[in-house]
Curated annotation (Swiss-Prot):
One of its GO terms (biological process) is negative regulation of DNA-templated transcription. Disulfide bonds: none annotated. GO terms for molecular function: DNA binding. Pfam families: HrcA, HrcA_DNA-bdg. Keywords: Repressor, Stress response, Transcription, Transcription regulation. Negative regulator of class I heat shock genes (grpE-dnaK-dnaJ and groELS operons). Prevents heat-shock induction of these operons. This is Heat-inducible transcription repressor HrcA. Gene3D superfamilies: 3.30.450.40, Heat-inducible transcription repressor hrca homolog, domain 3, Winged helix-like DNA-binding domain superfamily/Winged helix DNA-binding domain. InterPro entries: GAF-like_dom_sf (IPR029016), HrcA (IPR002571), HrcA_C (IPR021153), WH-like_DNA-bd_sf (IPR036388), WH_DNA-bd_sf (IPR036390), WHTH_HrcA_DNA-bd (IPR005104), WHTH_transcript_rep_HrcA_IDD (IPR023120). Belongs to the HrcA family.
Amino acid sequence: MLDDRSKLLLKALVERYIAEGQPVGSRTLSRASGLELSPATIRNVMADLEDLGLIASPHTSAGRVPTAKGYRLFVDTMLTVQQEQLPTVQLMPEQPQKVIANAAHLLSSLSQFVGVVMAPRRASVFRHIEFLRLSEKRFLVIIVSPDGDVQNRVIFTEVDYSQSQLVEAANFLNANYAGLTMEQVRERLKLEVDKLRGEIAALMQAAVSVGSEAMSGSQDEVVFSGERNLLSVSDFSSNMSHLRRAFDLFEQKTQILRLLDISSRAEGVRIFIGGESQVVPFEELSVVSAPYEVDGQVVGTLGVIGPTRMSYDRMIQIVDITSKLVSNALSHRK
């Protein structure tokens, strides 16, 4: 446990480093902390903080900078989020893809870092299904979602079906299962298979199988905006290795998606500093994220990706407000 003096000095050091981006020395801290302490005493406290892994000394400077561990302690115990007057913005309830793209742009423009939004996860609900015969034992399954999205999949069957059988299967599915998820339909079919003719049941089960894959196939898409903002961040512009790693991360997307998936299970804003998540092993990056909802159900996550040296209180506000805007826009879309 840190004593009050050590906490105050660490807080002053982190805030000064975030504001100026330069290693902070003992003389600077003696003026900034408000404590009546000599530079020598402050140096001793800084040495203790360094031993604890909370700050570090760059090779090129006598000053100190916060480590990921130091940032974490600062965020968890010392950060005070003051209400800041952010620009009044609104996300119009348009098509989900447009809302997501606009939200990513809003996050990047407000933060001047990288905005990221994981697209809503769609439950594999269908509104309407049709079958079209392409050739012998080869059929097209046409599935329409509640929001009008159309998915087509080709299936191959062991038996050939007549047009009347295709209509019979489609009518049964539409009359009894429209509005359910494909998983719910699959379970219901298992229970009702004895009531159906065997070949018709097999056709419907094949359709549900490809339908489940089709309706969930666009999940876990992620939209980035403002990647070029990192070119203006000294922490990256002065280190091409860091910059390349960041852009590789955005291009591959997999690690970011895993991190956002973790965030979707949290309540409110969550902060990942450096490589502490072990999902994105990048000490120079932090992610501030929050889930968003549609009609009260969490369907995705959004956030800001930037250097560990960021104004966390401001990022928390930006992410929190944007998540509420997205939730509102998607929930009220008609």
